[in-house]
């Protein structure tokens, strides 16, 4: 017990006394790796299934929207419980953090079981609801069957990973997620081609990879200094679920609305042909890859923010925030410059033989490169507000980029400029989201620093 208290004390000392620049970089390396691995193996999954045929590829695309919903629920419980845990650990209230860890985990697993069972019962209507045509419906059901079986593991793995991250143990989370991702890449061709399971093999590989990653993450929770998951710590308390809701609803809003926004863009782009859909899809994948690095860095910032906010070391929170904004802005500016210059070559890596795709994608990519440097502040502002428990402000800023501004910009710009409107809509939404988020974030920062002055 004394050893465990010493480890917890050592972690508290590190999180609240180590220079924030060094601390954030230490926390961010494993989270960046985790995010990039996830981005890469999602692209690899699509690559292998693409060799089966167009209908199989379409089925994976249809089910991917359902997987985004599972992820949104996982982030809801993971960020909701994790934010609260980091603040309580900063206050050195380990018992309350332990109750939240177990409550968040078991709640997510139960919701995953319910979604999985209901999905299996209604798999045909669910497949059609997600957008399956009669041609791809058989493939969708094959793939979706395994995804539904793995839903509890997928959802609760996201919770465990985020809880470990908010405790300052991102390396343990990285190991679990990376192991699952690498295993998925290895199993995909084996199940699809060697075992001749087709698209169902891709789903089976994903399910097994998620289950094994889940076990590794659970083991990570038993490492010294980490909070163990135990059913005896589960509490069906209104206050705990209120905190999960406060901390998790911004993530649910961001992830869920982003999926709806993507559907809207694909529908409008579809009016200009398959090349437009393909081009915008390629640009989205590229942007998501670089965005994953920014989110990964932000996930390194969040536990530092949560611990020090809980410990009332507001000056360290402010320093951590602005350091994170500077690093991500510089990174995205470099990406934007090279992306703008090399745009046609980057798009051609994905679809070299279609000049229409390259032309449409290059213009859209360059348009987004113009607003790309603003994304660092937008992401960090949202993560800061979410971590300190400003649920309403965090939800608004989370919704702003992909819904409040993107969908109206898309509809308006398409009406006036046609396909060009589709290509520039995300850049326009980014500028609006930046102008919207900045005053909200700065106001909350000023309120926090006023509290710092009162303490001193």
Cite the ranges covered by each PLM segment:
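N-terminal transmembrane alpha-helices
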Residues: 15-47, 51-52, 68-80, 84, ...
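Small-residue-rich hydrophobic transmembrane alpha-helices
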Residues: 57-117, 154-173, 266, 279-343, ...
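Hydrophobic transmembrane alpha-helices of multi-pass small-molecule transporters
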Residues: 69-72, 184-189, 214-218, 289-292, ...
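Helix-terminus/linker motif at the lipid-water interface of multi-pass membrane proteins
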Residues: 36, 40-58, 127-134, 190-197, ...
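Short runs within selected transmembrane alpha-helices of multi-pass transporters and secretion channels
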Residues: 78, 147-165, 175-181, 202-215, ...
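Transmembrane helical elements of multi-pass membrane transporters/channels
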Residues: 26-45, 146, 180, 209-213, ...
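Interfacial/gating helices of multi-pass transporter permease domains
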Residues: 48-68, 135-139, 199-202, 240-247, ...
């Amino acid at each position: 017990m004394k050893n465990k208290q010493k480890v917890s004390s050592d972690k508290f000392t590190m999180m609240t006394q180590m220079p924030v620049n060094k601390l954030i970089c230490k926390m961010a390396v494993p989270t960046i790796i985790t995010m990039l691995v996830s981005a890469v193996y999602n692209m690899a999954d699509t690559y292998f299934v693409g060799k089966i045929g167009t209908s199989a590829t379409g089925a994976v695309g249809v089910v991917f929207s359902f997987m985004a919903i599972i992820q949104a629920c996982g982030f809801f419980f993971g960020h909701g419980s994790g934010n609260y845990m980091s603040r309580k650990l900063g206050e050195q209230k380990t018992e309350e953090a332990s109750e939240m860890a177990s409550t968040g985990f078991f709640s997510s697993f139960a919701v995953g079981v319910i979604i999985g069972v209901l999905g299996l019962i209604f798999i045909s209507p669910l497949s059609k609801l997600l957008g399956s045509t009669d041609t791809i419906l058989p493939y969708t059901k094959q793939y979706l069957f395994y995804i539904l079986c793995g839903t509890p593991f997928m959802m609760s793995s996201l919770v465990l990973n985020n809880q470990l991250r908010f405790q300052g143990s991102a390396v343990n989370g990285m190991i679990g997620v990376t192991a699952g991702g690498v295993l998925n890449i290895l199993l995909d061709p084996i199940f699809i081609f060697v075992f001749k399971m087709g698209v169902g093999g891709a789903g089976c590989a994903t399910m097994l990879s998620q289950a094994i990653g889940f076990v590794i993450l659970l083991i990570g929770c038993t490492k010294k200094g980490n909070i163990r998951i135990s059913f005896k710590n589960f509490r069906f308390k209104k206050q705990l679920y209120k905190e999960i809701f406060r901390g998790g609803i911004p993530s649910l809003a961001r992830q869920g609305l982003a999926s709806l926004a993507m559907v809207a863009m694909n529908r409008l782009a579809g009016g200009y042909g398959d090349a437009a859909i393909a081009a915008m899809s390629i640009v989205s994948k590229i942007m998501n890859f670089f965005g994953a690095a920014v989110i990964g860095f932000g996930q390194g910032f969040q536990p530092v923010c949560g611990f020090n906010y809980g410990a009332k070391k507001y000056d360290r929170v402010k320093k951590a925030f602005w350091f994170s904004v500077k690093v991500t802005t510089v990174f995205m500016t470099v990406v934007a410059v090279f992306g703008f210059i090399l745009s046609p070559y980057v798009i051609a890596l994905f679809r070299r033989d279609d000049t229409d795709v390259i032309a449409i994608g290059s213009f859209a990519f360059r348009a987004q490169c113009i607003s790309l440097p603003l994304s660092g502040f937008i992401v960090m502002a949202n993560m800061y507000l979410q971590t300190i428990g400003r649920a309403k402000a965090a939800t608004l800023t989370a919704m702003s980029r992909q819904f409040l501004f993107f969908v109206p910009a898309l509809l308006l710009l398409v009406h006036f400029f046609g396909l060009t409107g589709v290509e520039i809509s995300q850049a326009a939404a980014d500028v609006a989201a930046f102008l919207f988020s900045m005053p909200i974030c700065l106001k909350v920062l000023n309120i926090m620093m006023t509290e710092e002055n009162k303490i001193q």
